Amino acid sequence: MISKIDKNKVRLKRHARVRTKLSGTAEKPRLNVYRSNKHIYAQIIDDVKGVTLAQASSQDKDIANTSASKVDLATTVGQEIAKKANDKGIKEIVFDRGGYLYHGRVKALADAARENGLEF
């Protein structure tokens, strides 16, 4: 009998494999994306110090009150994380898609962050 593939387990293995090659510094921190079925989260992380520099999610008060589609919420989260990064003087980042395909909500977040001043 063929067992069913656990997609999240495969994603976590892919993410771990990529993270060995991908790291953020103070000059060029890492933009990490986590996507659940209902929400999307983004963090800008300095891996050298192990510190989160900025974060935004679809559960933030100003974002969660809008009744929009999940892709629209991801776009808003991308705009918000870019605004917070610009306030802290962060212009360049390393994009970590978290093992997810660069499509849909992850792509919408990345495109919105690029349009609002982040370079990656």
Swiss-Prot record:
GO cellular component annotations of the record: cytosolic large ribosomal subunit
Keywords: Ribonucleoprotein, Ribosomal protein, RNA-binding, rRNA-binding
Residue ranges that the Swiss-Prot or TrEMBL entry lists as coiled coil: none
Matches recorded under Pfam families: Ribosomal_L18p
A GO molecular-function descriptor: 5S rRNA binding
S-adenosyl-L-methionine in keyword set: no
InterPro entries (UniProt xref): Ribosomal_uL18_bac-type, Ribosomal_uL18_bac/euk
Domain of life, per lineage: Bacteria
A biological process from GO: translation
PANTHER family: 39S RIBOSOMAL PROTEIN L18, MITOCHONDRIAL, LARGE RIBOSOMAL SUBUNIT PROTEIN UL18M
Subunit and partners: Part of the 50S ribosomal subunit; part of the 5S rRNA/L5/L18/L25 subcomplex. Contacts the 5S and 23S rRNAs.
Record's function text: This is one of the proteins that bind and probably mediate the attachment of the 5S RNA into the large ribosomal subunit, where it forms part of the central protuberance.
Family the UniProt entry places it in: Belongs to the universal ribosomal protein uL18 family.
Protein name per the record: Large ribosomal subunit protein uL18
UniProt lineage: Bacteria, Bacillati, Bacillota, Bacilli, Bacillales
Name of the coding gene: rplR
